[in-house]
Amino acid sequence: MATYAIVKTGGKQYKVAVGDLVKVEKIEGEPGTAVSLAPVLVVDGSDLTTDAAKLAKVAVTSEIVEHTKGPKIRIHKFKNKTGYHKRQGHRQPITVLKVTGIK
């Protein structure tokens, strides 16, 4: 089995391995900047680590590839019999990360 980790960022958890591209909630920083993510669980072959003391020694490093926006979400508010319609759209800012190491 390959080495992978479950990391938490932006209130969500992601399964990552070295070389993966991951789309996460926006993280401040320029493209090319190194970012360290906090692991929640690490699997190395058949060895599973969830102990907080051991996870404090583990670092999941990644690099910011680009900043982009997610898909368009359309909001439509409507009130009956009054002719009230309100349309609005939203695109969530996201950051694409490339995982460079699990140590």
Curated annotation (Swiss-Prot):
The keyword Ribonucleoprotein applies. GO terms for biological process: translation. It comes from the Bacteria. One of its GO terms (molecular function) is rRNA binding. Signal peptide: none annotated. Pfam families: Ribosomal_L21p (PF00829). Keywords: Ribonucleoprotein, Ribosomal protein, RNA-binding, rRNA-binding. GO terms for cellular component: cytoplasm; ribonucleoprotein complex; ribosome. This protein binds to 23S rRNA in the presence of protein L20. Belongs to the bacterial ribosomal protein bL21 family. Part of the 50S ribosomal subunit. Contacts protein L20. This is Large ribosomal subunit protein bL21. It comes from Rhodococcus erythropolis (strain PR4 / NBRC 100887).
